[in-house]
A protein has these predicted regions:
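Acidic/histidine-enriched, beta-strand-rich ligand/metal-binding domains
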Residues: 1-10, 14-74
């Protein structure tokens, strides 16, 4: 069975954890202000790009927040 959910702790002033589900291409971002957002239909290369980015917050604002539909979970 293939692992479809990847969860990673993140060193960032914006987020502390992130998850990616490769079955439905959803990305969960856990923000330091205790908000949790689920972004829909995020291609895998954005998930990988997040970890290559020198600033996670800038990457999220530029490539995730304005491009993908989302829901606030908390």
């Amino acid at each position: 069975m293939t692992n479809t959910l990847e969860s990673v702790m993140v060193e960032s002033s914006s987020i502390y954890s992130a998850e990616y589900n490769s079955v439905d291409n959803t990305m969960l971002l856990y923000f330091n202000n205790e908000s949790i957002y689920r972004y829909h239909k995020v291609p895998l290369f954005y998930w990988r790009g997040l970890f290559d980015a020198s600033s996670k917050g800038k990457f999220i604002n530029k490539f995730i927040v304005k491009k993908f539909s989302f829901e606030k979970l908390s």
